[in-house]
């Protein structure tokens, strides 16, 4: 109900020409409707913008979380390369465009477990734990990153290498833990393998080695190391880069053997969250330094190592994970 404003108006009636005439006061009540003005302020709702959809889908995160390279977009979805190198159709997923960093958790699946520590710790699981922690750290720093595998499934070396090229990455780091155990050492036996013809790979390798060595040296452990441990090229007897994750990608790449899972004291350390946090943070520092500075790192070994590693998992033993 509107409020009423009551105004008392006093009328004075006077007799003409008679100053002493009686004055009659007539009270009059006038009712005036008051006007209430209401101002409506529009409500503004702030929401986060949806993720940017790349103009070209270079890779895809499938509904099951597997990252695959995209061969082409189709009317019904995507044609992709599976982790085992097969072609498959996927109806939906999260498209990925150009990505700054690709992290490769070495090994994976039932057959390719990698080395196993005396405490039962499997290299494939440890590599993934470190890689996922590194991914989370890089995301916090505003750096785009994707993993070549996101769970315990097999993935062929050529497919992993191709993913880095497919997303036009600035760099790739393949994460590993070493075996067999060499002789005792006063410091960690971190080894970083680099591309023999790439100065960028050499610079990245030096940054990775320096940061990881500094982080691991804070732990009181009976370390083991090879005599030539450091940043080095590893060549096959044919004279080529020996490791598939080094020779395969066009992308600037390094393979980091962080320390020796085959050494029991080191394996006990690797089973702790403190280790995973320390080494992933060190790797993130190295990546950020590579992308934002001209720093060159340290630990370079002049003479290449000659070695013929075992080939990666073949197509006959590779079992693809579910994509949808």
What are these regions (language model features)?
Residues 3-4, 8-324:
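Catalytic-site microenvironment of enzymes
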């Amino acid at each position: 109900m509107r409020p009423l404003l009551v105004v008392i108006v006093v009328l004075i009636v006077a007799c003409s020409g008679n100053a002493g005439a009686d004055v009659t006061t007539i009270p009059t009540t006038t009712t005036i409707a008051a006007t209430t003005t209401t101002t409506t302020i529009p409500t503004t709702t702030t929401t986060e913008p949806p993720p940017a959809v790349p103009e070209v889908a270079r890779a895809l995160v499938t509904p099951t979380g597997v990252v695959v390279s995209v061969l082409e977009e189709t009317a019904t979805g995507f044609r992709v390369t599976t982790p085992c190198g097969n072609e498959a159709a996927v109806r939906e997923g999260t498209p990925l465009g150009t990505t700054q960093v690709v992290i490769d958790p070495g090994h994976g699946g039932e057959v390719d477990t990698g080395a196993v520590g005396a405490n039962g710790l499997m290299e494939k699981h440890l590599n993934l734990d470190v890689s996922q922690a590194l991914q989370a750290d890089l995301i916090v720093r505003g750096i785009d990153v994707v993993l070549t595998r996101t769970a315990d499934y097999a993935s062929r070396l050529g497919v992993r290498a191709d993913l880095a090229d497919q997303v036009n990455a600035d760099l790739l780091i393949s994460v590993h833990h070493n075996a067999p155990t060499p002789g005792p050492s006063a410091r960690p036996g971190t080894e970083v393998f680099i591309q023999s013809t790439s100065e960028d790979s050499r610079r990245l390798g030096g940054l990775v080695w320096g940061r990881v060595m500094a982080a691991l040296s804070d732990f009181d452990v009976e370390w083991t190391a090879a005599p030539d441990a450091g940043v080095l090229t590893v060549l096959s007897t044919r004279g080529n880069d020996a490791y598939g994750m080094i020779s395969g990608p066009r992308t600037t790449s390094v393979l980091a053997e962080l320390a020796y899972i085959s050494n029991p004291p080191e394996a006990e350390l690797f089973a702790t969250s403190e280790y995973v946090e320390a080494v992933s943070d060190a790797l993130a520092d190295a990546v950020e330094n590579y992308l934002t500075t001209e720093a060159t790192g340290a630990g370079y070994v002049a003479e290449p190592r000659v070695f013929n590693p075992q080939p990666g998992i073949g197509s006959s033993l590779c079992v693809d994970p579910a994509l949808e």
